[in-house]
A protein has these predicted regions:
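Conserved ABC ATPase "signature" region
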Residues: 1, 93, 97, 104-122
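Helix-to-loop junction immediately C-terminal to a conserved catalytic motif
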Residues: 44
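Conserved ABC transporter NBD signature motif
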Residues: 52-60, 68
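Conserved catalytic motifs of ABC-family nucleotide-binding domains
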Residues: 147
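Catalytic Walker B motif of ABC-type/P-loop ATPase nucleotide-binding domains
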Residues: 151-155
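ABC transporter nucleotide-binding domain
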Residues: 169-263
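C-terminal coupling/interaction segments
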Residues: 263-309
Length: 309
C-alpha cells in the first residue's frame, strides 16, 4: 500500500498482512512513523491507498468500504469526533443514524451502548462537562452501538489517567470476549499491551517485523537478564569490572550496589558465574528477571536501526 502526500509519494505500508480471529485482541506496536495510524485509517476508510490492496472481513477497503463500515467499530484517539455541546445520548443517536439505525432500533442501541460502558446515568449530560475517561467510554459506546464484528481502537487510553485506563482496558477486553469480536488496538502504554497477553504485531517503517503471541516474541528475542546485589561496594565494583570484560554480557544499569546484566542468547551462565568467583562472598542475591516490554522493544527497534540499509 502506498499513500501519496501532495509533494512526494511515500510507501507507508509494504506487504503488511495478518489475521485476527473472533474474540481476539491484536496489539499493533511501533515507534512514530511505523505505519500504525496509516494502517488504521486505511482499514476504516479514512485514507485511500494510491496502490496496493487492503481488506477487512474479505471486503476490499477501497471498493467495498461501505460494507466494511457496517461491520466495523472505530474508536479514534481524540475527542474531536464528539459533538461537545450535545448530550451523550444525542451523540450516539446522531452516530446511529449515520449507521442506518432508526426509531426503536436506534433508541435500544443507544441505551444498550450507554449501559455497557457505564454511562447511562449521564445520558443527558453534555459531553463538554465529562472527564477524559468518560469521553473515552463514550467513544467506545459509539464504536460498539451498531454491534460490529471488528473493533479498531487507536490509543483508547491516551488521555485517561492510570486508574481510568485500567478500567477502560478491562471493559474493552470484556466487550471483545463477550461479543466474540476481532479487535485491533494501538497504545504507547506498553504495560497495557503486556497486560493483555495478546496477539502482537510489530511495525517498523511500514514493514512487518513480527506477528504472533507476546510469549513467542519473548522466546524468540529475549535475552536472559540477571540482577546481582552485593553487600559491599568493593564487591560490587569488582563484579562490575569482571562482567564488563565478558564477551556476550552487557551491563544494562547499576543502582547502588546492584548490577543488572543481559546475557546474549546462546551464552552459558556457567562462565559468567565462574568469573564472579572472587566476589561470591559479597553476593547477597542473584535473580533472573523478566524484562519489561518497553526494554525488549527498545532492543528490537535499536537492532533494526543499526542494520545496514
Amino acid at each position: 500500500m502506498i499513500k501519496s502526500p501532495i509533494r512526494k509519494p511515500v510507501q507507508a505500508l509494504q506487504a503488511v498482512s495478518f489475521e485476527v480471529g473472533p474474540g481476539e485482541i491484536c496489539a499493533v506496536v511501533g515507534p512514530n512513523g511505523a505505519g500504525k495510524t496509516t494502517l488504521f485509517r486505511i482499514l476504516v476508510g479514512l485514507t485511500t491507498p494510491t496502490s496496493g490492496f487492503a481488506s477487512v472481513l474479505g471486503y476490499d477497503a477501497v471498493t467495498q468500504s461501505v460494507q466494511i463500515r457496517r461491520r466495523l467499530g472505530w474508536l479514534p484517539t481524540d475527542d474531536a469526533s464528539l459533538l461537545q455541546r450535545l448530550s451523550c445520548g444525542d451523540n450516539l443517536r446522531f452516530h446511529g443514524r449515520l449507521k442506518g439505525l432508526l426509531g426503536r432500533e436506534l433508541e435500544t442501541a443507544v441505551q444498550d451502548a450507554l449501559e455497557v460502558v457505564g454511562l447511562r446515568e449521564v445520558a443527558r449530560t453534555a459531553v463538554l462537562t465529562l472527564s477524559s475517561g468518560m469521553k473515552a467510554r463514550l467513544r467506545l459506546a459509539r464504536a460498539i452501538m451498531h454491534k460490529p464484528q471488528v473493533l479498531i481502537l487507536d490509543e483508547p487510553t491516551a488521555a485517561v489517567d492510570p486508574v481510568g485506563a485500567h478500567g477502560l482496558l478491562n471493559l474493552i477486553v470484556d466487550i471483545v470476549r463477550q461479543g466474540d469480536l476481532a479487535a485491533l488496538i494501538s497504545s504507547h502504554r506498553l504495560d497495557e499491551i503486556e497486560a493483555l497477553h495478546s496477539h502482537v504485531v510489530l511495525l517498523n517503517k511500514g514493514t512487518l517485523l513480527f506477528d504472533g503471541d507476546l510469549d513467542d516474541l519473548r522466546r524468540d528475542i529475549d535475552r536472559p537478564h540477571l540482577e546481582l546485589a552485593f553487600g559491599s561496594q568493593q564487591g560490587f565494583l569488582d563484579a562490575r569490572t569482571h562482567l564488563a570484560e565478558l564477551e556476550g554480557v552487557e551491563v544494562i544499569r547499576t543502582i547502588d550496589n546492584e548490577i543488572h546484566v543481559a546475557v546474549r542468547r546462546g551464552v552459558s551462565l556457567g562462565p559468567v558465574l565462574l568469573r564472579l568467583e572472587n566476589t561470591l562472598e559479597d553476593l547477597l542475591e542473584l535473580r533472573q528477571v523478566k524484562v519489561p516490554l518497553r526494554d525488549l522493544l527498545a532492543e528490537i527497534y535499536g537492532t533494526v536501526k543499526r542494520d545496514p540499509e
